[in-house]
Every structure is written in structure tokens, then in C-alpha cells.
């Protein structure tokens, strides 16, 4: 039984030699033969090259300093199998072996991890999502359409009372989900304890009056797992049901510690992820990265969206959406995809079409809701109307003729600058 990692290698030298070196260095080998590296030992734990698929040569090196004075830059996808006996199901061991010293090997001008296939031994080895798609929809009371969410803006600087005033306006707008910006955790001007105490009475009062409980995701991340757990408990004990976790900041250990004790929906923000992926010739594909966090138990996963304000192209978002929506072992291990970043109703039709005509997502709009010319309530209605049009295959411009909120949204945001 093996774990198969696919590396996209770029080198002016031999692809085969690089593949063999990765397999050796990341399992039993070192720079010279050593006593004890027997054939029996290697048969149990040595990695093996399974296959090499040649790709078009690179036009320019990912790491230019490595390629000086060399010839063609050969590229190939290389599948390497690592025996489960060498790794087990520990995710820190898997990350160490999959990445480890690979990026420091001499002779390559680039390397990227583009796929990972886990054996059935990982099924049940980690908790996975506690709520996921079904739980998120149940707790928000949303069926047959996306969960519509927004973000407290300004992202930083509001005091708890000021935040609660804004939240009061947002929950009356008809929105399903509100979150702290990922940068907001527990600063001196807005301690989490005070923010929870100011916001949750508004949420609960609205629920009592209307029967609808808006899901609010509080930022609870902390480098100290015990402190993060105390933050979690503050939210849970006040009647909250969701938390923002900055997964790269808290790490595998922090996420594992939290998930095993959590009673909250865990909304994963991947800030810092771009360090690992923005260079197309190095780093790691999201298809690989997301598997770790899903096994650890994130319930909702932010993955950007269509025509975002950041660098990521639409094709990358579509691939990410497909990745988180594809079961690792069972449909219950899929988190809810979260489309965000510069979103408003204008991206709804393309999002719907390109993600397989699904409404199983959280559609997160900041300025696209709160900056609507007629206020947040009109902003929410405009996004809902856009999704109604998308699902019915009606062009937005046509639907807007009878829906003034959508019409005003198109007028403000269609140039791509407003949201």
C-alpha cells in the first residue's frame, strides 16, 4: 500500500536521474551508501518511480540561477510511490516526505507537486469535516440556493459596539452568513470576548423574532492552541456556531487540536497560501494542499472566485472548486466551497455554469453587498436575484428589468471597480 505523489520536474539534466534522486533522498537514501541499507529494508520503505510523462520543454527557467549555461529545460510529470510503512497516516510525516528536501535538490530549475493519491488507510484516520456542506446548509436554513454571506468592513479598526451596530444592520438585511475579516482576531481595541458579547445578543434576538439564525464566524485563531480553544469556548458558550480559522497560521497541530474539541463550524481561510503556489513552476497545486486540511476537518473552505480582485485566474478557482467538491473517500468529507474576493451578483451566472450548475456553495460578498447604492438589504436582494437569474438561465440584464436592486447593482459594479 502506497501514497503516490506527482512531481512536475523542470531540469536541464536528466529527468530520470532527478526522479530517482527524489525517490532515494525522500526515503532510504543519503549522499553515499550506508551500512544497514539492505535490500530487505529498501523493499519495505524505499520509494519507487512509477511513471514519467514527458511535457513540453520550458521556455524559461523557474529558478534562473540554476540554469545558467545549460541547454534545453526538460519538463515531466513524475509519479513516485512512497510505501505506507514509511509514513503511516500522520500528516506531518506525509508533508515532510512529500516536500522535505525535494526543493533543495541540485540540478533542477523548478519543481511543483501537482497531485497526491492517498490509500484507503487514510479513510477514518482523521476526523474530517464535522458539519461540511449539509451542516452549513442546515444551520443557516438555506436550501435550493447558495448561502449568501458578507464580511464586516472596515476589516480592522471597529470597536465591539461599532461592530455590533453594523452587524445589526446586516442581519436585518436578510443575509445568511457574516464573518470577521481574517485579519481580525483579538486586538486590544476589539478583544474577542467583548466582540462576542456585543454581537451575539443581536444574532439571538433576531433569531427569536424571525426564526432565522444568521451564522456569524468569529476570528478565533491563535498560535497557542489552548488560547485558541478558549476563544472557541467563548463563541460556543455565547450561542455562536461558526469560527474563522487561519489555517496556515495555526498549522496542522493547531487545526487537529481544535477540530477534535470543536462544536463550531470551522471556516478555513488560506491566507499565505499564495507563497506556496503563485509561481507556476514551483510550490504545490491546491489539489494537493486542500487534502491535508480536509482530513484535519475544515467545514468551509475559501477558494477565491470568478473575476477576483487578486492574481488568481478563473481557471484556478474552477479547479479548486472541483477539488474541494470531489470526495477523498466519501461525500461527507467535502467541505462547503466558499467563493469570495470582489464578488457581487455579476459573477453568479458564470460561477453557476462553470462549477457544474450547483448551488452548494457559500457566496461571499463584501463591498458587493454593503456598498450597494440602496444599502445592505438591497445588496443582499441583488445577489439573491442574480442567483435566481443564473439558475433560471435568464440573462442578468433581462432579469434586472423587473428587479431594481439587481439593476442598481449592475449599474454600480459592472465595471469591475466597485466591489
From Swiss-Prot:
Q: What InterPro entries does this protein's entry cite?
A: OiaX, RuBisCO, RuBisCo_large_chain_AS, RuBisCO_lsu_C, RuBisCO_lsu_C_sf, RuBisCO_lsu_fd_N, RuBisCO_lsu_N_sf
Function text: Involved in catabolism of D-apiose. Catalyzes the decarboxylation of 3-oxo-isoapionate 4-phosphate to L-erythrulose 1-phosphate.
The reply to whether Metal-binding figures as a keyword in the UniProt entry is yes
Q: What is the lineage of its organism?
A: Bacteria, Pseudomonadati, Pseudomonadota, Alphaproteobacteria, Hyphomicrobiales
Q: Which cysteines are joined by disulfide bonds?
A: none
- Annotated pathway: Carbohydrate metabolism
Q: Which residues carry this modification: N6-carboxylysine?
A: 179
Question: Pfam families of this UniProt entry?
Answer: RuBisCO_large, RuBisCO_large_N
Q: Which residues bind Mg(2+)?
A: 179, 181-182
What EC number(s) does its UniProt record assign? Answer: 4.1.1.121
Write down what this protein is called: 3-oxo-isoapionate-4-phosphate decarboxylase
Query: Keywords, A to Z?
Result: Carbohydrate metabolism, Decarboxylase, Lyase, Magnesium, Metal-binding
Name the family. Answer: Belongs to the RuBisCO large chain family.
Q: Which organism is it from?
A: Rhizobium rhizogenes (strain K84 / ATCC BAA-868) (Agrobacterium radiobacter)
EC supergroup of this enzyme:
lyase
Q: GO molecular function, one example?
A: magnesium ion binding
